[in-house]
Amino acid sequence: MEYVKSIIDRYKHLRSLRQLGEGYRGMYAFVGIGNHSTSNLYPVLSYLHVPLKYIGCKSHDKLPLIERAYPGVKATTSLAEILSDDEVKGVFVSIAPEAHFDIGIKVLESGKALFVEKPPCRNAQQLMQLADARKKAGNPTVVVGLQKRMSPAMQLLKKELARCSEPMTYNLRYLTGAYPEGDALLD
């Protein structure tokens, strides 16, 4: 178990060095202030030091509460205000799924990068509209929130699978404990 702990510690150290060396070239906005956002996404953005300029929501009475909870961030109910700000390079969207497409297409039409929780749209026609909007805007980065797909384990697996010349199968299990601080084998 000591060996596993040393690997985890080494990984955390290297990850920390990499993250501190990387900087962001602009500000970002976040649309949505629901439970998933506040419990899962905002802590990750804080940990990664992603500079947020705006938090957008649909409720005027939440604006002062948001600004108190997130100092230095402007709370707004205006998506147009966010999208017209040239300093904002990308927008994170985590709202009701039925609104993902409408907000996502506006973000892409503004030329900004988009992170949107799944599902990004409801049907193939909307998906094609998103793809077309992305092309027209110069191909800004688009990421759909499929957490497991972005995990370090999956990135390593993709590299290994790319070297294979024959079809293969694999069985992948995710640990759901307090990794990396917990017991990586038993949690």
What are these regions (language model features)?
Residues 47-48, 70, 85-86, 137, ...:
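Acidic-histidine catalytic/liganding microenvironments
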Residues 2-70:
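N-terminal Rossmann-like dinucleotide-binding module
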